[in-house]
Design a protein with these regions (language model features):
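Extracellular/periplasmic carbohydrate-active domains that bind, remodel
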Residues: 1-156
Length: 156
C-alpha cells in the first residue's frame, strides 16, 4: 500500500512460512491505495505514467516463499505497480492457494476503478520481473495468471 505522494523505498522484503485461512486476497501489492486523505485524487489514481520525482514510491524486490492460503475469496494475488516506477521484482516460490466453496465477492485491492469479483487468479501489472516458481492456484474461475506490462515473466 504505497501510492504516489508517499516517497518510500521498499527493498529486500521477504515473507515466508505463512499460513492463511479465509482471507479475501492473500497477496496484495497496490501502488494506487485509496485510503489516505488524497487517495481518490487524480494524482494518486491515474493509470497514466507521471514524472518520477521525490514523491514517487519505489518498490524494488519482494519475495513470497512457502506460503499456503486456504479458503480464499476474491483473488489469489493482486500486484499493481506504477507505470512510471514499476515494481522491480516479485518472486513467488512454493505458493499454494485454494478458494472457499462459497467465496464472497469483494475488491481485490483498495484502488479506484475495480469491480467486485471472486475466485480470481493472480493479476500482475507494471512489474519489471515476475517469477512464479511452484505456484499452485486451485479452484479459480478463469485464468490462473494474468499479466500486463511485465518486462520479464518467468514461470517454473
Amino acid at each position: 500500500r504505497r501510492g504516489r505522494g508517499k516517497d518510500a523505498v521498499l527493498d529486500e522484503i521477504i515473507f515466508e512460512n505463512i499460513r492463511m485461512d479465509h482471507v479475501m486476497t492473500p497477496f496484495v501489492v497496490n501502488c494506487f491505495y485509496y485510503c489516505d486523505p488524497d487517495g481518490h485524487t487524480d494524482y494518486v489514481q491515474t493509470k497514466e505514467a507521471l514524472p518520477v520525482d521525490e514523491r514517487t514510491p519505489e518498490i524494488r524486490n519482494l519475495a513470497f516463499r512457502d506460503i499456503e492460503a486456504s479458503n480464499c475469496h476474491v483473488a489469489a494475488a493482486y500486484l499493481y505497480g506504477l507505470p512510471e516506477q514499476k515494481i522491480g521484482q516479485v518472486q513467488m516460490e512454493r505458493i499454494h492457494v485454494t478458494y472457499a466453496e462459497d467465496a464472497q465477492m469483494g475488491l481485490p485491492a483498495m484502488m479506484d476503478g475495480l469491480g467486485e469479483m471472486n475466485y480470481a487468479g493472480i493479476y500482475a501489472n507494471n512489474i519489471e520481473t515476475l517469477i512464479l516458481e511452484d505456484v499452485k492456484i486451485e479452484g479459480q474461475h478463469g485464468p490462473a495468471v494474468t499479466v500486463e506490462n511485465i518486462d520479464n515473466f518467468v514461470e517454473k
